[in-house]
């Protein structure tokens, strides 16, 4: 027994030394890599059943990925992994991100992952890619999001056909726009937020009008054009159609705003089709790399990723979740809200942005300065990547920008970048 005890003690001593050495070796490793945005590209955003409706999300994703790689000016085989957000995946076939990646001409050996965090999917893809690059798992990655809401199918339950027939369900509503906990539409959650923060319909309509006018001004000034990867649509027996401008922001009649009926709450409702985002098609992609890779490849980055964070609240309060993610960013970066030159808060509904402005106490003039999803459109898997990419283009050198987006289920994601 004494011999056995001595042997056990020796083993414990050896294990303790090994653990100590492991900790010491780990602690001596280099710090996290800095991650930069080398390029950002997106397709135009198409209206529901509009100009891009003939193309699946995966094709739109391919166009955005290819443009991001080309604009970074690097060989396609330098991209070692791809993350793409996509929410409404039914009927697209296996592994949508893989389809988009190979369709963009990237190497067959490129691993891919499809991310679904509802409306935050595109942004979460950027965050996950940044983590992988920071940790040194990869040196060059593409991240973004894609959605073709025009091509989302209907479904019916499997099983014996019941008496009276079967019920078809719209998967846009079922998988994209319904709070599964409270069994209500996202718009009802928006109405709850409007009531909680005393935000009137008039305020929401006014915000929506500003969104449209800002989007038009940004397009008219040429500010958005450099983000766009044109989409070519082949026509049988006719010239190809080349789509190179957002479709939604031009489809508006301001005189109808005050006359529209509320959609989700009949009595004392505030949310209408005019002050909400629309159903849309589009894709966005960012090429991310470490600064070491940027130096090796002679790439001049657009911006660097400073910090990112998620937050979660009660599912019905999902519209205000970004206000809980943003303080985490500022704390991590050692910045104050006054240091932020540009805010992009996704306009799922006008009330989302108005409520977050109130909660964060930020200057409305710095929020969605060039329009947002109410006017440009909201392809739900794309939008999070779009607003990060837009900031990377629109900020001026040395400025900081924060992009935040809410997602169904009570979540939000946010990213802080600095223009280089």
From Swiss-Prot:
Family matches, as Gene3D superfamilies: 3.40.47.10
The annotated site for Increases nucleophilicity of active site Cys falls at 378
Keyword Acyltransferase assigned: yes
Record's PROSITE patterns?
Answer: THIOLASE_1, THIOLASE_2, THIOLASE_3
- Give me the Gene Ontology terms describing cellular component: mitochondrion
Q: Provide the catalytic activity annotation.
A: 2 acetyl-CoA = acetoacetyl-CoA + CoA; propanoyl-CoA + acetyl-CoA = 2-methyl-3-oxobutanoyl-CoA + CoA
Homology family: Belongs to the thiolase-like superfamily. Thiolase family.
Indicate the quaternary assembly.
Answer: Homotetramer.
Q: What is this protein called?
A: Acetyl-CoA acetyltransferase A, mitochondrial
Organism name: Xenopus laevis
Write the lineage as a comma-separated list: Eukaryota, Metazoa, Chordata, Craniata, Vertebrata
């Amino acid at each position: 027994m004494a011999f056995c005890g001595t042997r056990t003690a020796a083993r414990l001593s050896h294990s303790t030394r090994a653990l100590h050495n492991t900790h010491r070796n780990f602690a001596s490793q280099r710090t996290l890599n800095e991650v930069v945005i080398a390029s950002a590209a997106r397709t135009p955003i198409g209206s529901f059943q509009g100009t891009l409706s003939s193309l699946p999300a995966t094709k739109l994703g391919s166009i955005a990925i290819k443009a991001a790689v080309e604009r970074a000016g690097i060989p396609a085989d330098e991209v070692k992994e791809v993350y793409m957000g996509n929410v409404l995946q039914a009927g697209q076939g296996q592994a949508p991100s893989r389809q988009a990646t190979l369709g963009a001409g990237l190497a067959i050996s490129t691993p891919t992952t499809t991310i679904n965090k509802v409306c935050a999917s595109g942004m979460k893809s950027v965050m996950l890619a940044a983590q992988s690059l920071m940790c040194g798992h990869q040196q060059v990655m593409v991240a973004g999001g894609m959605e073709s809401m025009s091509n989302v199918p209907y479904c019916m339950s499997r099983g014996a056909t019941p008496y009276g027939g079967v019920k078809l369900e719209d998967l846009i509503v079922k998988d994209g726009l319904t709070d599964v906990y409270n069994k209500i539409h996202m718009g009802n959650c928006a109405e709850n937020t409007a009531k909680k923060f005393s935000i009137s319909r008039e305020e929401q309509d006014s915000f929506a009008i500003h969104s449209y006018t800002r989007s038009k001004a940004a397009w008219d000034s040429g500010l958005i054009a450099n983000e766009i990867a044109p989409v070519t649509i082949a026509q049988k027996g006719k010239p190809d159609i080349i789509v190179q401008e957002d479709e939604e922001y031009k489809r508006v009649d301001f005189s109808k705003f005050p006359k529209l009926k509320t959609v989700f709450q009949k009595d004392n409702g505030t949310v209408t089709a005019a002050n909400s985002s629309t159903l849309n098609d589009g894709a966005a992609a960012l090429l991310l790399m470490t600064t070491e890779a940027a130096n090796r490849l002679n790439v001049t980055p657009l911006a660097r990723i400073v910090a990112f964070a998620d937050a979660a609240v009660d599912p019905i309060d999902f519209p205000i979740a970004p206000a809980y993610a943003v303080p985490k960013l500022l704390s991590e970066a050692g910045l104050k809200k006054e240091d932020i030159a540009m805010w992009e808060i996704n306009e799922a509904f006008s009330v989302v942005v108005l409520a977050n402005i109130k909660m964060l106490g930020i200057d409305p003039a710095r929020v969605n300065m060039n329009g947002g999803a109410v006017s440009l459109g909201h392809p739900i898997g794309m939008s999070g990547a779009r607003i990060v990419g837009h900031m990377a283009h629109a900020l001026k050198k040395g400025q900081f920008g924060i992009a935040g987006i809410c997602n169904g289920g009570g979540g939000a994601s946010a990213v802080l970048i600095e223009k280089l």
